[in-house]
């Protein structure tokens, strides 16, 4: 029995050469191609004993190796399994718990530190036969109130202070005035 997937590169190359196929270098990118070719050669229906094909008459020049081909057909049991790859790759099973969808509308909203409320789906109501939807996403009142409580962000304050100092420095150097005089 021959397990094509478990053959090393050298053994794969030897098997192909035994069957009359001259493979090139076996690389990870060409390995699957050579495995398929080996399976083709092993599975092909049995014919007469090895046959020597004479030189072909074509217009182009040929090498002496290509002029004679040896066709050997072997019968054998082939295992086309991926047992080796199954053993190596054990994927963790997907969890059955449902993941909550991320609310992309409120990514910039930072809740105040206090009580934590359970996340809920946005409320959608149809009123008086019209198609108006009221959404519970980031209410404008909440963001304005939290901004008033916190004031300006520290980074913004530092940036304004830095720009102010640079403007004062440029003004003093252009006017050639001393800082304390």
UniProtKB/Swiss-Prot annotation:
Known tissue expression: Testis-specific. Isoform 6 is detected in 17 of 18 colon cancer tissues examined.
Localization: Membrane
Q: How does it sit in the membrane?
A: Single-pass membrane protein
Pfam families tied to this protein: LEM
For this protein, the record's InterPro entries field holds: LEM/LEM-like_dom_sf, LEM_dom, LEM_domain
- Indicate yes or no for the key word Membrane: yes
PROSITE patterns linked to this entry: LEM
TM region(s), chain numbering: 152-172
| Keywords, alphabetical | Membrane, Signal-anchor, Transmembrane, Transmembrane helix
Q: Which GO terms describe its cellular component?
A: membrane
Which domain of life does the protein's organism represent?
Eukaryota
**Which residues belong to any copy of the LEM domain?**
1-45
Put simply, this protein is called LEM domain-containing protein 1
Q: Which organism was this protein described from?
A: Homo sapiens
Lineage of source species: Eukaryota, Metazoa, Chordata, Craniata, Vertebrata
């Amino acid at each position: 029995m021959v397990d094509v997937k478990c053959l090393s590169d050298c053994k794969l190359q030897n098997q192909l050469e035994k069957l009359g196929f001259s493979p090139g270098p076996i690389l990870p990118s060409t390995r699957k191609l050579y495995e398929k070719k080996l399976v083709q050669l092993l599975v092909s229906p049995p014919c007469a004993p090895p046959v020597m094909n004479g030189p072909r008459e074509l217009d182009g020049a040929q090498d002496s190796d290509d002029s004679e081909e040896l066709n050997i057909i072997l019968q054998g049991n082939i295992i086309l399994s991926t047992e080796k790859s199954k053993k190596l790759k054990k994927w963790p099973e997907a969890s059955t718990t449902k993941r909550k969808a991320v609310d992309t509308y409120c990514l910039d909203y930072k809740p105040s530190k206090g009580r934590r409320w359970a996340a809920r789906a946005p409320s959608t109501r149809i009123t008086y036969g019209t198609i108006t939807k009221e959404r519970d996403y980031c209410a404008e009142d909440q963001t304005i109130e939290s901004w008033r409580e916190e004031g300006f962000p520290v980074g913004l304050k530092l940036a304004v202070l830095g720009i102010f100092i640079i403007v004062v420095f440029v003004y003093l150097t252009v006017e050639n005035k001393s800082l304390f005089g």
